[in-house]
Amino acid sequence: MMKIYEGTIISCDRENHVNRYLVEDKGRILYVGDELPAAYQGAPREVLGERTLLPCFGDTHLHFMSYALFNAGLDVRSARSLPELCEQIQKFTRENNDKIIMGFGASTHCVAEKRLISKDELDRACPDRAVFIVKYDGHACIVNSRMIAMLPDKVKTLRGWHADTGEMNQEAFFATADFITKKVSLPRTIRNMLRAVDDMAEKGFGMMHTVSGVGFPLDLDVAMEMILGKGLDSGFQSRVFFQTMNLDKIRKKKLPRVGGCFATALDGCFGSEDAALRQPYANNPQNRGILFHSNEEVIHFTKQANREGLQIEMHAIGDAAFNQAVMAIEAALEDCPREDHRHGIIHACLPSEEGLQKCAELGIQIPLQPAFLMWNLEPLEFLYSILGDRAERISPLRKMTDMGIVLSGGSDAPCTLPDPIAGIYAACNHYIPEQSLTIPEALKLFTFNAAWTTFDEKERGSLETGKMADMVILNRNPLTMKPNELLGLKVEHLLLKGEPYKKGQGMLSLLAKGLLPGGRI
C-alpha cells in the first residue's frame, strides 16, 4: 500500500538534499520532494513531527560469524578486575553446558591489574572445561591448559605460541581460532546468526559487509553467510568478502569480491603491538610490528584478483602495512587498468601522507571504524604510549575526505558492537578536533558511502526516486543537533522494502530460501 512520509526527509544523496515529502509504494520510493503531487494526496500519511527519516544504515566491515558467536556467548568487556572477569567465566560456565567456553573482550586497559588474565587464572576459574577468551581487538586470545591440550601439534610450532602464559598471537592465534570454530554445531551457528541480524536491525542496519573465512571445515562459514544473505526474508542485505588469497575458492563461490582480515590481513593491531610501522614503537625501539606477507606475495594476489575483475579489500593498521597495500593495488592497476574497481584498504588507522595521495589518485576507498576513536578498551593514553605523537595522525577523517577519498563506516564487530549512532558521534568528535567530519558527512559514512562501497548505490544508500525504500526513523533531526549531542539519537523504526522489520525468522525458512539459486550477496 502506498504511504506518504511528511516531515524532515534527509536523503543522504550526493547533494545532501533535505525534503518534506517521501512517497513509498511496493517497497520502492515513488517520489521525494518539497511539494506533494496531487496524485498522491489521498494516500495514508505518517507525520514525522520532531522525528526524521533517513536511509537505513550499513556496516562496511564486520566479522559477522564471530560477532554472531560471541553475541550469544560470554562477553567480558564489562569486567573491571581480573577476579570479576573470573566470576563472569564461572557464572557463564554454571549456566551453559558448552564443552569449550568461548568469550570475548579481554583488555589490559579496563581492569585494575592492567594486564591480561593468565592461563593459570583461567585454570583456577574453570578447571574442568576448555576456555578460549579472545582479546578485545580480535587479534589475540588467552586459553587455559585444557584448551592447550586439545590443540593440534602444528599450532604449537607457529609464531605467537605462548604456552606458558596461554596468550596466542599472530599465526598461532589464527590457527587456534580456526580449530575452535570447527567445534561449533551448525544449528547453533544458524540460530546465532539470525539473532545477530535481529540485533543489528534494532540499531537501524539494513546492510552489512561481512568478512568470512575463519577456519570452518570446507569453508562452511562462507557458505552459511552466503545462504544467510539470500535467505533473509526481511530484505536485510549482506555482502560477503571471502578472506583468502586462494582465488580458486572465490571462483567456486562465484563471488565478485575478495579480502578482509585473517588471510588477507597485512599486519596485526595496536593492542598487540604488532601493527606494522615504518618507525619503531615508542615504547620499544626493537619493535616495528609484523608484516604477515612479503611484497611479492601481496602483489601476486592483487594482480591476479584485479585481472579477474574482483573487488579487493585488505586489512592494514600501521603505516608500513598501509603503504604495502597501496603499493600492491597500484601494481595491480598498472598491470591491468580498471576505471571503477573500488578496491579498499580496511582500517587504514595510521596512513602515510604519500599513501593517501596514491589512494586519491587511484580511487582506493577506505572502510574505517570511527568508534575506534573513542574506544575505552584501547584508550588514547595507550596509543600515545606506544606511538608517541603518531597517535595524533590516527584516522585523519577530515584530511582524507578533503582529498576526495571515499570513506565508509563499520564496526569491525565483535571488536566494537555494530552501532551507527556511536560511529557517527565519533566521526564528528575526533580527539583531534580539526579532523572531525560534519554531521552530513558522518551520516554518509553509514548510508550512501556504505552502499557505494559494494556497488549498491543505484538501489540503496540514499532516499531518491526509484530506489529501495530501506529507511530508518530517528527520534530527532541530527542536522539540528550539536556534534556532542549526537548520542541522543535513537533508532525508532527500521523499514526494509517499506515494511517494518520483523524479528524472529526461523531456521527452516532461512534455509529454504537461502538454498535457492539467485539473489545478490
Residue ranges and their predicted role:
Residues 63, 258-274, 364-374:
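Non-cysteine beta-strand/loop elements that form the S-adenosyl-L-methionine
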Residues 222-256, 260-261, 351-361:
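Extended hydrophobic/aromatic segments used for targeting, binding, or gating
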